[in-house]
């Protein structure tokens, strides 16, 4: 077993390491040689079979899953349920002991109690199982990503194979629309682009080509990865990784192999069980010894021991906690947070660090034109539907020239039948940048289609990674000018070097060094804002060289690509969501650290972080300080910088201590260009600091981090199936602001669970104490076991649940996250208040009512002591009371049952006050008010239920409840009032002397 664990740990540590391969660096000939493949014919069938035998099929290995019955048993026998099962078994044991000793009187009580306890556990176990049945289907969702078929070269023949039959060294062809069937080294490519977003988090499609461009295998252009989508062009590649050894396979192995540990609330409930069990066993054993010393038979003493332990078990609490969490989960679902795991409801409330993805979570995942540069000035683009924010002259020649090039030099088109849809919401064919430009042109001119029709496209060279530009030639809409119009867009520096003139303020002027500097300043400024900048230029081809009908050749350009006229720049960004800055500010005031973890470029990441407030105004990074002081970065003390932007490259070989140093000393952090393994390392680093970590993500690459986090939050709209399976919670609107709502709800439910528990536990003392007096002073039993059940599973249930609806006492988002070590769900102070203070007053109320009724019927209090043996003896039918009246056995038992009923009603009456004081932990009830209508209903409900149980005919047979005289309801009222006054005084002192001894002893 230990060996297996060691092996699993070793495997996971391997998977956590960065991808370390050299297939992208070595010459292609060496690649063929290493893989035993032939560029002309591919593998032979014999080679393929041998490779498959050696490496296995090209598919993901499913992990060992926990059988459903084991999950069900965990719900049925785990945690709190175990305490109730112990109680049930002890009841059956007591029943067995009494049955064997021939004591018929209490037989049925213990039997009923055992059956009811077992039923409660089974019902709540089934309920929890259905609520939390998040059977980890992570691997199933990875299977959905696996391509089904692939076109491969075997023995010189192109054959269609099942993707799982591919093996190392196979040469395959991939075209637009396919999923990449394995990890491939690119041999040749034609305008080939892949969507790596689910793997690396980059929202832009990435061009792939045979050139080696980066040491990092995830960044180089000559590798394409298993299960990513081909979105443009065609490609030929050689298989260098299959199944579990692909990048995707490693992520799958990491996500499914991680051990997630217990949730904070599960730890709290375990801690609570220890306390309750400790109290129960201590009391039970103490009174077992006392009973023995007092001369009771050992069988009686064992029954007493069991009775005390069972009376200590709050039978209704398991159901209360489950229902409270379910209600909060439903409330969160209505606010766009879908909780898959009930315990995650509270985890979000105790979160102290949020590691958020950028694309789609903090931003809109919709590239938008943000700025333009023409006529020598930077202008903010207007992306409003009605153009109400326009800040530039749309009649200027500079703008008209730029927008015409933008409309023509683009392959993006609106999908059909969307004329009634607002422009910003229309779907577009083409990549994200092209779509942004198309929408910008359509918003400002409203006639993209018309411009294209008037200037018919003749020839085009599509964008490719080598040229870094796109160029097209069009007929001129000005029919009097027969010249063809050439338009070009691309990387600004590449466009500028192809231009000899610039169009400025309606005139074409020569490109001077001064103008180049103005261009560079604009380019740097826009780039520094984290925006993706494109340059635009045009040229009217001379009529003498390019007459009407000239045969343009796109493959071997027979037209000029230099000496062009520069028109301007457009810059795009994936803009932040409107609600995010406010949400980040709320997190900060709630003491929650927000860290951005993204696969995007550091400059873009930093710009978005600044715009949403993750890096607050005035806080500098090491680079900012170095730039301000004009010194090298190495001379700046990292601790002087409050903010940090960490490149994924720095994390490749970082030690845990160095990462801890970064996390500890920088309150504001952005991790950029991170890989899936690095996201996981960052989460583990935060957890080492003692933080409770929430992680947001939408890609497959986020799934290991989502699984490892204390709470993983996936995106409902843009999220991949894999990320949704790995997460504990799904944001239905993909909005970071919804997490803050979730944190608020989580904190509120933790506070309210404390209130529910203190309310429920208080009635334990009036339930246990009758039993103790029964043993110590030999009095007739004041409260029966069945009656205890009527309280725990009857009158107390609805009030306890109603506290889940209580409003927050103060702004819970203005305090720091709870410390899991010191701020427990149930602590000594809560036990002291429930048992030692309020519980004692309640017990006094019960005994007062008991003695009043006994005295009224003839048994004065001092005459009850030592009476039990005669009272419980069937043989005694002439027991005399304090006034000389004789009582038969049946009459005595009827009086005893009336006392049980009155004691039960008195507990209900003092629980009125207990429920009202439990509404707040510090504030006065008068401040809080009685706006919780569910709680108001609960007060009426428990009273009506008590009356129903007391006055319904037939209850004397089933529950031994007898109708009470009306005046027997009143003796407990002063005690109820006393509880209210006592607690209001305690809270008044709490508020007047914060941190004083009253707070230290009683504030739970």
UniProtKB/Swiss-Prot annotation:
* Enzyme's top EC category: translocase
Keywords from UniProt, A to Z, are: ATP-binding, Cell membrane, Ion transport, Magnesium, Membrane, Metal-binding, Nucleotide-binding, Phosphoprotein, Potassium, Potassium transport, Sodium, Sodium transport, Sodium/potassium transport, Translocase, Transmembrane, Transmembrane helix, Transport
Q: Which SUPFAM superfamilies match?
A: Calcium ATPase, transduction domain A, Calcium ATPase, transmembrane domain M, HAD-like, Metal cation-transporting ATPase, ATP-binding domain N
Q: Has UniProt tagged this entry with the keyword Nucleotidyltransferase?
A: no
Q: Where does this protein reside within or beyond the cell?
A: Cell membrane
What segment(s) does the record annotate as region Disordered? 197-216
Identify the main location: membrane
- How does this chain sit within the bilayer? Multi-pass membrane protein
Question: Which cysteine-cysteine pairs are annotated as disulfide bonds in the entry?
Answer: none
* GO CC terms: plasma membrane
Give the EC number(s) under which this enzyme is classified.
7.2.2.13
Enumerate the InterPro entries for this protein. Answer: ATPase_P-typ_cation-transptr_C, ATPase_P-typ_cation-transptr_N, ATPase_P-typ_cyto_dom_N, ATPase_P-typ_P_site, ATPase_P-typ_TM_dom_sf, ATPase_P-typ_transduc_dom_A_sf, Cation_transp_ATPase_P-type, HAD-like_sf
Question: Would the keyword Endoplasmic reticulum turn up in this protein's UniProt record?
Answer: no
Per its record, the protein catalyses: K(+)(out) + Na(+)(in) + ATP + H2O = K(+)(in) + Na(+)(out) + ADP + phosphate + H(+)
Q: Where are the transmembrane segments?
A: 76-96, 110-126, 272-294, 301-329, 768-791, 828-855, 897-918, 934-959
Q: Which GO terms describe its biological process?
A: intracellular potassium ion homeostasis; intracellular sodium ion homeostasis; potassium ion import across plasma membrane; proton transmembrane transport; sodium ion export across plasma membrane
Which GO-annotated molecular functions does the record name?
ATP binding; ATP hydrolysis activity; metal ion binding; P-type sodium:potassium-exchanging transporter activity
Pfam families, alphabetically?
Cation_ATPase, Cation_ATPase_C, Cation_ATPase_N, E1-E2_ATPase
Functional note: This is the catalytic component of the active enzyme, which catalyzes the hydrolysis of ATP coupled with the exchange of sodium and potassium ions across the plasma membrane. This action creates the electrochemical gradient of sodium and potassium ions, providing the energy for active transport of various nutrients.
Protein family: Belongs to the cation transport ATPase (P-type) (TC 3.A.3) family. Type IIC subfamily.
Subunit info here reads: The sodium/potassium-transporting ATPase is composed of a catalytic alpha subunit, an auxiliary non-catalytic beta subunit and an additional regulatory subunit.
Q: What is this protein called?
A: Sodium/potassium-transporting ATPase subunit alpha-B
Originating species: Artemia franciscana (Brine shrimp)
